[in-house]
């Protein structure tokens, strides 16, 4: 076995360690809460009604948490469609050229009919040498997955997967339900945690008040109640900050990568280039049908290869002024931004500036056509 192949195999094995750790914590929390707290402790104190309510609510949060976590892990990140790959002749000419300028000319001709509006910081076509494809807007190459991922947000070690277009909604729901799960566990365990410290801080259970429904009456629950509260509180605080940050990103229609390195458009760098207004930004991730918002079912809008941009239909000079003054905030809430299919997309970014002057802003009108579809793969 080649050293590189062996290294990749080791990486894949080690990548599952954080997932196994989370799985162990979740399984232990289930046992500690259901068996040690509810069955062995609360039910024996005569509080049958409380036990039933706690168990029903707990299993609701638990199922939604595990479901969203599973979908985040096993939903395969989408890669660019075949339109973004160079043809054999284009690839051969590109590899034979040593001049970067001529290579860019080849890429510009290949990308003329693609819905690409962003470039690299040096105004070059974003091309992936490893995957040998022209990167769609917001797509990036993940070194851990060794592939280009559509609308890549980040590679998350806790799910051993890339978070991108196909599973970003699942990732958000995973954060939400893990937050609610930890909050519920911490809040319901707190009562018995306090009794443990205030009523029975003595050397043996024989000295504890016999009429108190305290966890020390059941020695096996002491360890679990103590650590269950600490673990749930700790995870709640850490997940809360991460969830708040990603809510802010969704509201701004940015990825984690774009928050650190704003995309480059024809009119310059614009961190809000894909922002259509808070409401539309949220619907891009969660979809138009509210009944699916809280369910780990794919409902995101678009095809992952092309995204509506707020200034794309404007003259470059006007766009530059609008970008500086942030004058287009109202666009997001009032005007539609349809996504054009790849077969009928007109690439304004890669055309010459003279075409802007000839065609004017009317080039921004979207043609009708068949839609591209993204297939969400679930790996078993």
UniProtKB/Swiss-Prot annotation:
Biological source species: Mus musculus
Highest taxon of source: Eukaryota
Lumenal compartment residues: 36-53, 191-222
Residue sites binding Zn(2+) 2 per the record: 142, 145, 155, 162
TM annotation in the entry: 15-35, 54-74, 170-190, 223-246
Protein name stated in the entry: Palmitoyltransferase ZDHHC20
GO biological process terms on file: peptidyl-L-cysteine S-palmitoylation; positive regulation by host of viral process; protein palmitoylation
Gene: Zdhhc20
Catalytic activity entry: L-cysteinyl-[protein] + hexadecanoyl-CoA = S-hexadecanoyl-L-cysteinyl-[protein] + CoA; L-cysteinyl-[protein] + tetradecanoyl-CoA = S-tetradecanoyl-L-cysteinyl-[protein] + CoA; L-cysteinyl-[protein] + octadecanoyl-CoA = S-octadecanoyl-L-cysteinyl-[protein] + CoA
EC number assigned by the record: 2.3.1.225, 2.3.1.-
Residues that hold Zn(2+) 1 according to the record: 128, 131, 141, 148
DHHC domain location: 126-176
Free-text comment on this protein's domains from its UniProt entry: The DHHC domain is required for palmitoyltransferase activity.
Residue stretches in coiled coil: none
Single Gene Ontology MF annotation: protein-cysteine S-stearoyltransferase activity
């Amino acid at each position: 076995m080649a050293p590189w192949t062996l290294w990749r195999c080791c990486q894949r094995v080690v990548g599952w360690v954080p997932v196994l750790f989370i799985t162990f914590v979740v399984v232990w929390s289930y046992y500690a809460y259901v068996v040690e707290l509810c069955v062995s402790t609360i039910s024996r104190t005569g509080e049958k009604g409380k036990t039933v309510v706690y168990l029903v609510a707990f299993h609701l949060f638990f199922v939604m948490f595990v479901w969203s976590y599973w979908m985040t892990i096993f939903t395969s990140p989408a890669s660019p469609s075949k339109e973004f790959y160079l043809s054999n002749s284009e690839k051969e000419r590109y590899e034979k050229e040593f001049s970067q300028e001529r290579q860019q000319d080849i890429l510009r001709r290949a990308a003329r009919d693609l819905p690409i509006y962003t470039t690299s910081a040096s105004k070059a076509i974003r091309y992936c040498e490893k995957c040998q494809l022209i990167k769609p807007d917001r797509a990036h190459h993940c070194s851990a997955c060794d592939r280009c991922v559509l609308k890549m947000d980040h590679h998350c070690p806790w799910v051993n997967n890339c978070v991108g277009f196909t599973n970003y909604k699942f990732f958000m729901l995973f954060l939400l339900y893990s937050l609610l799960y930890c909050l519920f566990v911490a809040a319901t365990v707190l009562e018995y945690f306090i009794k443990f410290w205030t009523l029975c801080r003595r050397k043996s259970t024989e000295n504890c008040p016999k009429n108190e429904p305290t966890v020390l009456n059941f020695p096996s629950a002491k360890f679990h109640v103590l650590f269950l509260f600490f673990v749930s509180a700790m995870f709640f605080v850490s997940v809360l900050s991460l969830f708040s940050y990603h809510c802010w990103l969704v509201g701004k229609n940015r990825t984690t990568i774009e928050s650190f390195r704003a995309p480059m458009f024809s009119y310059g760098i614009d961190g809000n280039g894909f922002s259509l207004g808070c409401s539309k930004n949220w619907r891009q991730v969660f979809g138009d049908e509210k009944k699916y918002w809280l369910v780990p079912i794919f409902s995101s809008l678009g095809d992952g290869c092309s995204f509506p941009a707020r200034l794309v239909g404007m003259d470059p000079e006007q766009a530059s002024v609008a970008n500086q003054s942030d004058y287009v905030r109202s666009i997001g809430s009032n005007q539609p931004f349809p996504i054009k299919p790849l077969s009928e997309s007109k690439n304004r970014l890669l055309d010459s500036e003279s075409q802007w002057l000839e065609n004017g802003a009317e080039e921004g009108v979207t043609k009708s056509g068949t839609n591209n579809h993204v297939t969400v793969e679930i790996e078993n």
